[in-house]
Amino acid sequence: MGNLPSQRITPDYPFLSVGLDFAGPFYIVNRKGRGCRIVKCYLCLFVCLRYKCIHLEAVSDLTKDAFIMSLKRFISRRGKPTEIFSDNGTNFVAAAKEIGSFIKRNHEPLVDFASQQSINFKFIPAYTPHFGGIWEAGVKSAKHLLRRVLGDSHVTFEELSTLFAQVEAILNSRPLCPLSSSPNDLLSLSPGHFIIGRPLIALPTPNLEDVKESQLRRYERLERLRQHFWKRWQKEYLSELQQRTKWRTNTSKLDVGDMVLLADDNAPPLAWKLGRVLRLIPGPDGISRVADILTTKGCVRRALVRLCKLPSAEDLNG
């Protein structure tokens, strides 16, 4: 495997080098009330190659003008990138065929517009999706869960744009690594720190998952979709951090002072429960299966299978 490109390892401003990808289609209604029509819209994803920050834009259709407007919205909010990486639109999957044909059809106009803005538009070689793994992972995190969360629900373009923005906040709140190696520091570094300089915090809202669909207003249904997305995303993200191995030997690599995520199925959106390992408690066979964790609300005891270690600076550099 080759070395990481310089855009991935050179410190600089967020969204200076970005990866671009499309996902969809998502089916929405053109207006509220009776007589509405079902139309398509798409998700345009921008991911920062340095800090894995994600920006989501709803695109009304696959035209050059619609994409350029979404790019202008991105530049207005995140700043102008120096280079944009994208695939070349070659897709075998039927659902992605129209997206691929759009990119191939507008290859030259997109490059011309980017060059006018002093942006270097780069396309990866054909049939090499692994060259764009960082934005493919972002699309997977957003698209697959959004499809399962939305299901057969048909929202308006404005409601879908709001949902995309809330999903973006969830993805940008994920813990990357501890802020420091101090055992008393219970804060973690997230992509949100590079965007606004502090963690992203959501407004408190009541749990709507157990309320009947017919009793919810449109705004409450949108909030319910967000809460559903949070639960699914949290479980999938935690499973990526955990190593699925058999418990025949002591495979725990937790040490005192490590920062961990506490798996909690009832955690509200954007509320990641973090803590530091105070003490490992061995069993009669000498294998530790339980640990005392220092959190902002005191010391708690949790099984190791409910703890996910955040990578340290040595892990990231090694």
PLM features per residue range, with description:
Residues P175, P183-D210, S214-R218:
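Alpha-helical scaffold segments of alpha-solenoid architecture
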Residues F113-I195:
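Charged alpha-helix within mobile-element recombinases
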